[in-house]
């Protein structure tokens, strides 16, 4: 599910897969070949999240950042099941 937040809209820049019950909100950029799996939450409400090419965010992981912070995953990165990544 893609959700806007305060005028910020997630961007899918290249056929990224997002599972039906995953949430991608706000200032999030998904690069080509990236995947976001079941139950994962990517919250770009306070800062930007960039998911690099061919990276995957596995089931139930949460990515979020504080105001002014950012999370950037490079290419071919795996964020494991139920991980918490906070920038």
Model-derived features: where do they sit?
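A short, polar/charged loop-to-alpha-helix boundary motif
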Residues: 49
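Extreme N-terminal tail/first-helix region
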Residues: 1-16
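Left-handed beta-helix
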Residues: 14, 19-20, 25-26, 31-32, ...
């Amino acid at each position: 599910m893609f959700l806007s937040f305060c005028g910020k809209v997630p961007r899918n820049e290249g056929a990224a897969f997002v599972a039906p019950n995953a949430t991608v909100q706000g200032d999030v950029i998904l690069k080509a070949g990236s995947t976001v799996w079941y139950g994962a939450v990517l919250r770009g409400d306070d800062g930007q999240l960039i998911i690099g090419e061919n990276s995957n965010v596995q089931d139930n992981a949460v990515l979020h950042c504080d105001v002014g912070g950012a999370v950037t995953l490079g290419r071919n990165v795996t964020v494991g099941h139920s991980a918490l990544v906070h920038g």
